[in-house]
Swiss-Prot record:
Superkingdom of origin organism: Bacteria
Protein family per UniProt: Belongs to the MdcG family.
Species whose genome carries this gene: Klebsiella pneumoniae subsp. pneumoniae (strain ATCC 700721 / MGH 78578)
Protein name: Phosphoribosyl-dephospho-CoA transferase
Function text: Transfers 2'-(5-triphosphoribosyl)-3'-dephosphocoenzyme-A to the apo-[acyl-carrier-protein] of the malonate decarboxylase to yield holo-[acyl-carrier-protein].
EC number: 2.7.7.66
Amino acid sequence: MSATPRPHDLVWLNHASALEDIAEPWVAQQWRAALPVVVRRDVDDQARVPVGVRGMKREQRAAGWVQARNIVRSVTPEMLVDREVLLHSPFVSQPPVQGAIALTLHRWPWGWGVTGSTGYALATEIPVLHAASDLDLLIRASQPLDREALLEWQTRVAQLPCRADTQVETPYGAFALNEWLRDGRALLKTSRGARLTATPWHREE
């Protein structure tokens, strides 16, 4: 893989042994290389890619690392909101997928995608969705976005047939859109921890 993986991307590895520094015993029993891991936010002095492993139970999440050379496939959140992908998903009748389809009917001035359990289900066709599942949304924003357009997005998201939350990804981290619109500031999750900021598109030393 030549492109640098970004947080929330799903990546497949060339071998189970490519997953490094995993302590949780359930991973060896449940995870195999045919299943993707999700890129998370962290830093490593060995230039490895930080990833998370999803288990069968909701509480089963494990953090690990992989060498970029061992990644053989990558699916981004944006790839999962192609309308044809959504319409042909085996989970098309589930409320989170219906919600994603509804959002594709509008042309947004930014790239966006689906993460979380809905993204995992769309990418793998593994039935981890149910009627009460949330829809986790991601907006990629390298530059500040128009507030009125974001308010329109929030209005449409509030009308979806499921609970939905949006994170906005900036060059310096990610923040909850509803928090930022409501308070004028938000907790920015960065690779080195979280910080409260009103300017998530600006680096703070």
